[in-house]
Amino acid sequence: MDVVEFRPTPDQFAWTFGGVAPTHRITPGTALRLWTEDAFSGRLQRTTDRPSEVLVMTEVNPQTGPFYVEGAEPGDTLAIHIADLRPARDWAASTTIPFFGALTGTDRTALLQEPLPERTWIYQLDRAAGTVRYEAKNLSLDLPIAPMLGTVGVAPAGREVRTSLVPDTFGGDMDTPEMRAGTTCYLGVNVPGALFSVGDGHYRQGEGESCGTAVEGAMDVTLVVDLVKGGAPAWPRLEHDDDFAVVGSSRPLEDAWRASQVGMVTWLGELYGLDPLDAYQLLTQISRSPLANVVDVNYSAVTLVDKALLPPAQAYGGIHAHLRSVAKGLL
């Protein structure tokens, strides 16, 4: 198995999906050991830092990549297995940004109100305990870390170039806590080589990412990348040992939810030979629907189905179990 290590310098970050030359060409089955910068490009370091003063808004959500996967063609399915996610710093940051977040007026939800005050929180990491420290004026809490990647995506179709702040059919900034170690992410390939990137590490995040920023931190990332010929899903699919999941992204929020639901109806049909109405009925009785983000240009919703409620099925020929086995040798 080939193993590629890459720690990008600031001039090597990608800020978009599409429109960026690949940093590496890899073959299916390659393992990647990567470093990702936090969503703020490391610029928020103190509680006195104000986003309007220290952030460059064209340089947020830096991505590591893109990677060109040999043999990947439009219509294929890229399988990205997250083997390991480890905080790369002993601190992380979260903040309120003017006109950004679920509970404030924004450029798209215009309200006659002033922006919320800017405030920055710095979370100190206790590696031994596996916690981050939330500090407020009247409360301090140690919260368990739950590392995840906010952003995983491929180049969009139709020569589109999309900012790394947008989730859509190509993946992107989905911000779902389901994108964690042990997850295999299936993305439809839109361009030769797929051109996938990852980034936006979170040390933990609640469902919905309400204020718009999680516990944002640099991350050491280990992936195994493989390719399935054909079978491209319309929306990103995730597989854990315990669940199947589909992520839909759109506005309004109910359309993001609908996209994830329709995506799961389609997947259940593929896995079990169900017609759409039978799959629709089954989905109605067994699915769970956590929110991923309600703050980005598109919102993201997740539809999850517990494998324990279903007969055994091998999605994409059982590639999740294969990649999980391969990943064990990297840890």
Cite the ranges covered by each PLM segment.
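Short, well-ordered loop/turn sites that connect or cap secondary structure elements
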Residues: I26, V69-A72, M179
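Short, Lys/Arg- and Gly-enriched loop/turn segments at beta-strand edges
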Residues: A39-R50, L85-T96, G193-Y203, A292-V295
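N-terminal, Lys/Arg-enriched amphipathic/low-complexity engagement segments
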Residues: M1-L55
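Short, structured beta-strand/loop micro-motifs enriched in basic residues and often containing a Trp
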Residues: R7-F17, M57-T64, R162-F170
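Conserved mixed alpha/beta catalytic, RNA-binding, or beta-rich assembly cores of soluble enzyme
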Residues: I145-E254, V265
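Intrinsically disordered, low-complexity linker/loop segments enriched in Gly/Pro
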Residues: D84-R180
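A generic structural signal for residues embedded in beta-strands
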Residues: L34, T77-I80, L187
